[in-house]
Amino acid sequence: MTEISILNDVQKIIVLDYGSQYNQLIARRIREFGVFSELKSHKITAQELREINPIGIVLSGGPNSVYADNAFGIDPEIFELEIPILGICYGMQLITHKLGGKVVPAGQAGNREYGQSTLHLRETSKLFSGTPQEQLVLMSHGDAVTEIPEGFHLVGDSNDCPYAAIENTEKNLYGIQFHPEVRHSVYGNDILKNFAISICGARGDWSMDNFIDMEIAKIRETVGDRKVLLGLSGGVDSSVVGVLLQKAIGDQLTCIFVDHGLLRKDEGDQVMGMLGGKFGLNIIRVDASKRFLDLLADVEDPEKKRKIIGNEFVYVFDDEASKLKGVDFLAQGTLYTDIIESGTETAQTIKSHHNVGGLPEDMQFELIEPLNTLFKDEVRALGIALGMPEEIVWRQPFPGPGLAIRVMGAITEEKLETVRESDAILREEIAKAGLDRDVWQYFTVNTGVRSVGVMGDGRTYDYTIAIRAITSIDGMTADFAQLPWDVLKKISTRIVNEVDHVNRIVYDITSKPPATVEWE
């Protein structure tokens, strides 16, 4: 079966990207209902959408005003495709503006709303089926709709928003001023599910097995009989990519595992044992630790660290690939969240990701990124579907730059060792407490801060280690994990007693946002 025939057999809901940092959550929520969904540029044409043949279209939120000179628009023929359309926030305003309604600029009618608000449903609607007449939703808008287009009617309002939900059932056009994709909209999932299943008619039968078939077909079509080089980092993402690629192209895949001197304790041997031994991947192990650490000496800026590591990885691959024959592709474990955090055409860059930023312009390979439409929890599900053991699939997420971004300031062997040893203790105690599946991610950070302490009746002046532990569903938002005090106490006691050059432990209680998961 070709990639085209596989894709045509999969029902799809397309989300048009209008610039919200979290609009990809819309696609993620829809996938939870067993419906494939992905983001496309707002510049997509009606003809291009016809070729994709989606069963539904969502217009995402965004920071712009429909009146701005640089406002993101829409091909007007999209409204004539007879495909159900749901406009969210800016998307609703765009529908209104383009179809003859009225949108009032921010502040003119006291219409700004930020935070949770109560939605009052005034009429029944398939979109809100099974949800209460009054419900909490997350509003985040300045402009507001004050007159709706012909053929539309009011479904719901809020105290500060006269048109919080509208619809034209004859043309299957729906608009909501709030954000159902975020958890602060209590019945947001129900609303999106109603759109996908009841309005768009989705079967809800998309699964990771479908994804595997699609990606294998895509990889085989792209690669043909050529060869692929994969950089193994030791993390879940690159490991899953390796197994998927091997399933698709077999011995056309060569893996390079670069030991850059920034790995967790014993990680190099574990990677070789699991992937090289159990799964039979062809892995070349390269000890490039001195090469990386020399380049990183005295570098304090986190963006410079990422760029240096991203560049050097590719240069190492270049060196190794030159010893091989006919390698045309470089595979990476880039995820959806990596791309969004690195910025898109419509979204601001939060921080560059080592897989999508810092690559040199003269790179000799074409890129293959099989996971770049998946979120972290979906990658784990993919690993299980590929038959990978849980000890690999549930490995703690580990960034490509490794411990370089878990050491604040300049990197030294001494600092790296404090993080390796403290992180090993943290992971061991979390597992002993049976919390390793409940906590999304956990690791330690050398803060670069020294403080005075007393050990053995003597004065110390040593490093402060921070513990970071979070809970999350998809990695886009996160809360700090409320670890039991007795577990934290045991971890702290062990670290200060067993790890040299550490005399103080702190616990990071910051959510995302405003913080990111990693410190750098």
From Swiss-Prot:
Active site: C89 (nucleophile), H179, E181
Gene Ontology terms, MF aspect: ATP binding; GMP synthase activity
Protein's UniProt keywords contain ATP-binding: yes
Domain GMPS ATP-PPase, chain residue ranges per copy: 206-395
SUPFAM superfamilies, alphabetized: Adenine nucleotide alpha hydrolases-like (SSF52402), Class I glutamine amidotransferase-like (SSF52317), GMP synthetase C-terminal dimerisation domain (SSF54810)
Keyword Plastid appears in the UniProt entry: no
Start and end residues of each Glutamine amidotransferase type-1 domain: 12-205
PROSITE patterns documented for this protein: GATASE_TYPE_1, GMPS_ATP_PPASE
Disulphides: none
Assigned keywords, A-Z: ATP-binding, Glutamine amidotransferase, GMP biosynthesis, Ligase, Nucleotide-binding, Purine biosynthesis
EC main group: ligase
Annotated binding of ATP, by residue: S233, G234, G235, V236, D237, S238, S239
Listed EC numbers: 6.3.5.2
Pathway membership, UniProt: Purine metabolism; GMP biosynthesis; GMP from XMP (L-Gln route): step 1/1
Function field: Catalyzes the synthesis of GMP from XMP.
PANTHER family noted in UniProt: GMP SYNTHASE [GLUTAMINE-HYDROLYZING], GMP SYNTHASE-RELATED
HAMAP family associated with the record: GMP_synthase (MF_00344)
Protein name, per record: GMP synthase [glutamine-hydrolyzing]
Species name: Streptococcus pyogenes serotype M5 (strain Manfredo)
Taxonomy of the source species: Bacteria, Bacillati, Bacillota, Bacilli, Lactobacillales
